């Protein structure tokens, strides 16, 4: 049986989910497939045959660090892999990165739109350097965001700048490299040793384009991700299986690459 690891999901404490999901639905004019609760994600995983999910939290203000870290500790298990978050404007951001590693987590999630930064600005580089030094994986929202004005704060050129400046950083460019900037992903990123997750992208791309993009990229640097609850995990698996990839490549994307990456961050 193929190991499946969803490297890009979201969930919230129950009381937060009840507020957050309707607000996010309104901002992005999208409908969630789940209610944002952890129990619903696990039920979805069971239905889709997904063994593990990475939960990507986002600290939208410095004061959220402690509560996100605490909740992440509470929910982690052999199937749930939380990636906590810190806010770059926190006065002790460097110490918070160290605390995430000290608590035993494998990675961190950041989001330029929700956290008010440009991907390659100078103030971010010491933070990325610390993340790299701690051996943490950095899952970064890249490309535009459906809920925000289309400002170019996380485009492929900026991704490449970060990778060049911090060469040891385990950086995952989400949404197939950069959401809704896929022509630039093709031009600038494909073929380079940069991790791409496939979240919230396959249903928006023509099948042949998605297949060609996957085949143009190093097969060890592709990760399955759904962006649940904003897509159905089962539907994204079906979309991937419909691309006609080899069984060996599909196994790497579904879980083999993720398992190797996570093992290296333990």
Where are these regions (language model features)?
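Short, well-structured secondary-structure segments
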Residues: 49-64, 71, 77-85, 109
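Mid-to-C-terminal alpha-helical segments outside catalytic/metal-binding sites
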Residues: 2-10, 17-52, 216-221, 234-266
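Hydrophobic faces of well-ordered beta-strands that scaffold small-molecule active sites
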Residues: 5-9, 53-55, 81-85, 106-110, ...
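Divalent metal-binding pocket/active-site signature
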Residues: 34-35, 59-63, 88-91, 102-186
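Conserved, mostly hydrophobic/aromatic
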Residues: 8, 45, 72, 100, ...
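H/E-rich (His + Asp/Glu) clusters that bind or coordinate divalent metals
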Residues: 176-266
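Acidic (Asp/Glu)-rich catalytic clusters
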Residues: 42-49, 69-81, 95-104, 125-133, ...
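N-terminal/domain-start segments enriched in small and hydrophobic, helix-friendly residues
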Residues: 46, 50-51, 124-147, 190-193, ...
């Amino acid at each position: 049986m193929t190991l499946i690891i969803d490297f890009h999901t979201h969930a919230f404490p129950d009381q937060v989910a009840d507020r957050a999901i309707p607000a996010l639905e309104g901002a992005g004019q999208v409908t969630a497939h789940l209610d944002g609760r952890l129990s619903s994600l696990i039920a979805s995983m069971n239905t889709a045959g997904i063994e593990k999910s990475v939960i990507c939290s986002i600290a939208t203000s410095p004061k959220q660090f402690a509560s996100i870290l605490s909740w992440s500790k509470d929910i982690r298990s052999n199937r749930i892999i939380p990636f906590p978050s810190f806010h770059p404007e926190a006065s002790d951001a460097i110490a918070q990165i160290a605390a995430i590693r000290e608590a035993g987590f494998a990675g961190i999630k950041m989001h330029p739109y929700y956290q008010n930064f440009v991907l390659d600005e100078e103030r971010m580089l010491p933070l990325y350097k610390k993340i790299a030094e701690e051996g943490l994986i950095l899952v970064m929202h890249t490309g535009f965001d459906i809920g925000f004005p289309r400002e170019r704060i996380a485009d492929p050129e900026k991704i490449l700048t970060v990778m060049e400046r911090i060469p040891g950083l385990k950086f995952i460019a989400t949404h197939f490299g950069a959401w809704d900037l896929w022509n630039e992903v093709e031009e600038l990123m494909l073929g380079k040793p940069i991790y791409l997750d496939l979240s919230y992208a396959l249903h928006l791309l023509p099948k042949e384009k998605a297949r060609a993009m996957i085949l143009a990229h190093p097969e060890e640097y592709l990760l399955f991700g759904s962006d649940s609850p904003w897509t159905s995990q089962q539907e994204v698996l079906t979309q991937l299986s419909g691309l006609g990839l080899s069984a060996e490549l599909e196994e790497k994307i579904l879980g083999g690459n993720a398992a190797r990456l996570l093992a290296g961050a333990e």
